[in-house]
UniProtKB/Swiss-Prot annotation:
Record has Oxidoreductase as a keyword: yes
Gene Ontology terms describing biological process: purine nucleobase catabolic process; urate catabolic process
Protein name (database record): Uricase
Keyword hit for Cytoplasm: no
Main location: other
Modified positions (N-acetylalanine) in chain numbering: A2
Compartments where located: Peroxisome
Modification N6-succinyllysine, positions: K10, K23, K221, K228
Known pathway: Purine metabolism; urate degradation; (S)-allantoin from urate: step 1/3
N6-acetyllysine modified-residue sites: K10, K23, K27, K36, K118, K122, K164, K175, K185, K221, K228, K278
Name of the gene this protein is made from: UOX
UniProt lineage: Eukaryota, Metazoa, Chordata, Craniata, Vertebrata
Pfam families referenced in this protein's UniProt entry, alphabetically: Uricase
């Protein structure tokens, strides 16, 4: 029978690995009005702070704790006075505020996710104040800064759903007694892209333009030329091609992580009804699904 001790009020046998607290999902819509022309940024922000002391954990002493409600209010006020030019600059502003305002804050971490609003446009004319929700990839960022250190900035894309109906296959894989999957030269390829990249600390970055560039590269390597496509022998190859092209075209990026679920569409068997279904009617299969991941970084020699 296990025996449990009750004398952990002051214990020398355990130590903290990491601590933090904060406020998640602080939602803000910021409107910038330039006459009748309006611009918007809707974001959800999460903030985590690490303090120099642990007395709130050890003794229930809250004298160093910045209330999470104060953190929420601070984010709202910073949005008002600083605006949201990009979610990355907004996240850096939040980190710098808490580190400069409170000497006992030793680390600030901020996650910001942008709601994908797009301005109405018709025949090349942009509407002055109307927007449409366009879920074709969500822009997010993660910024971490420790006291006396530079901010480490990651940007990313998630929830970018793409599908092509041909120019994909999967052959030459290992087959054992449990393998039932047939080789296929032509199949549907569908995925929901998640990718995240880290910026070089010593470079000025146009975050909005860089995000647009990376998204365009992802779509380009997935789809290929518009008139004929591009063959993908595996999800892994497509993933790697995206990374190589991105680091080749965007010098501001140091490393890149991508996760691609392989979302299956299965041919529906209609033989019992006397019909031959030639990959015309498919069953979308939510799960289970394969998931392929990879992270690449620049070699040291490529930075010189």
């Amino acid at each position: 029978m296990a025996h449990y001790r009750n004398d952990y009020k002051k214990n020398d046998e355990v130590e903290f690995v990491r601590t933090g607290y904060g406020k998640d999902m602080i939602k803000v819509l910021h409107i910038q009005r330039d006459g009748k022309y309006h611009s918007i940024k809707e974001v959800a922000t999460s903030v985590q702070l690490t303090l120099s002391s642990k007395k709130d954990y050890l003794h229930g002493d809250n004298s160093d704790v910045i209330p999470t409600d104060t953190i929420k209010n601070t984010v709202n006020v910073l949005a008002k006075f600083k605006g949201i030019k990009s979610i990355e600059t907004f996240a850096v502003t939040i980190c710098e505020h808490f580190l400069s305002s409170f000497k006992h804050v030793i680390r600030a971490q901020v996650y910001v996710e942008e709601v994908p609003w797009k301005r109405f446009e018709k025949n090349g004319v942009k509407h002055v104040h109307a927007f449409i929700y366009t879920p074709t990839g969500t822009h997010f960022c993660e910024v971490e800064q420790i006291r006396n250190g530079p901010p480490v900035i990651h940007s990313g894309i998630k929830d970018l759903k793409v599908l092509k109906t041909t120019q994909s296959g999967f052959e030459g894989f290992i087959k054992d007694q449990f393998t039932t999957l047939p080789e296929v030269k032509d199949r549907c390829f569908a995925t929901q892209v998640y990718c995240k990249w880290r910026y070089h600390q010593g470079r000025d970055v146009d975050f909005e333009a860089t995000w647009d560039t990376v998204r365009s590269i992802v779509l380009q390597k997935f789809a290929g030329p518009y008139d004929k496509g591009e063959y993908s022998p595996s999800v892994q190859k497509t993933l790697y091609d995206i990374q190589v092209l991105t680091l080749g075209q965007v010098p501001e990026i140091e490393d890149m992580e991508i996760s691609l679920p392989n979302i299956h569409y299965l041919n529906i068997d209609m033989s019992k009804m006397g019909l031959i279904n030639k990959e015309e009617v498919l069953l979308p299969l939510d799960n289970p699904y394969g998931r392929i991941t990879g992270t690449v970084k620049r070699k040291l020699t490529s930075r010189l």
